[in-house]
Amino acid sequence: MFSEIWKIWKNLSIWKKLIFFIGLFVLVFFMSFFVDYALGRAVGDGKFVYELHIQPGTGYKKVVKELIENKLIRSELYFQFLLKITGNSNKIKQGIYTLNDSLNTAQIINVITTGKVKTITFTIPEGYTNRQIAEVLLNKKIISDKKNFFDAAENPEIIKKYNIPANTTEGYLFPETYTIPYNYKPEQIVEMMLKRFFKNLATIEESKNLTPSELHEKIILASIVEREAKKKEEQPIMAGVFLKRLKIKMPLESCATVQYLFDKPKSRLLEKDLEIASPYNTYLNKGYPPGPISNPGLPAITAAFRPVESDYLFFLVKPDGSHYFSKTHTEHLEAKKKYIDVLYE
C-alpha cells in the first residue's frame, strides 16, 4: 500500500506537490485554531474572580484540577498539554493569584509561571515603633496576630544574622512604603525591612567600619531625634543638643523616651509621668536608654552621624511644631512661659 502511494507521489509534478503541502499546512493551521478556540479560549467575561493559592511543592496536576473545578479553563487535558509543550509544567510558582474567567488558557499559564502574584502595599511612617508597625500590618490584614510579628522582630536568629546588639530589632526596621505578596510571613517582612535599613545606612559614609555597639548608640540617638523633632531641618541641631548633654553628664531629659513606655503616646506628659521608674526614663537616668525608642528614617539617622554643634542646651516645641532652642535654663523657662504655659492654661 505504502509502495503504491510512494509511486503516485513520485509521479506528481512539483506544482502538485507544492499544492499538497500548502493544503496540509492550511488544514493543520485551521485545526490548531479550532482546538485553541474550542478548548483554550476564555470561559467567561471576567465577572467571576477567584484567588488561586499555590502552596510550595504543589504539582501542576493539582493546580489544573482546581482550575477546572472552578470553571476557569475549558479542558484539563488541553491545559496540561500546553504546559508540557511550552516547558512550563515545572515552572509554576507558589503564591496567591487573582484570576478571572476572562483569561484564556495561555494567559493563565503566563500568570502562574511568571509569578504575577497578588500583592499588598503598606506604609510605615518614620518614627513608628515596632508596636505601631504591628498595628499597621494587622489593620492591613497582612498578619492575623500582632504576637506573630513581635516574635519575628525578636527572633534571636534574625538578630544574630544582622549583628544587632539587642534582643529586638527596634530601631532597625526601616520606615518606608513596601509592596509584598499576600502570603509573606512576618519573618520575611522583618528581614525585608532590615535589608532596606542597611541599604540606606550604606549611603552614610560615617557609618562604615563601626562596631555593632557603636552603630547601636547612633541608632538610639536617631530614634530619639526622630520622635522629638517634627521638622527635618531641626534634627541635626537636636542631635547636637543631646550629645552636648551627654558630654557634660546631664540627663537627656527626652519626653520621647518616657512616651515609649506607653502603648499609645499621650498628648501631653504629666509631672507624675516623668517620675516613672524605668531605664527608659531619661529624666531620672543619665546616658542613653537601653535601646532605640522608634524606627528612624534616613534624615534622623544622618543627623545622628552629622550633628550640628551649637551653644544650645535646651529646646521646647512651639505650637507650629517647630522648636525653640535655648542656651541657658533661664532662657528656656522664659520660652516655656511664652509657648507652653500659654498653650495649656
Language model features with spans:
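Signal peptide-directed extracytoplasmic domains
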Residues: 32-201
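N-terminal type II signal-anchor transmembrane helix
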Residues: 2-47
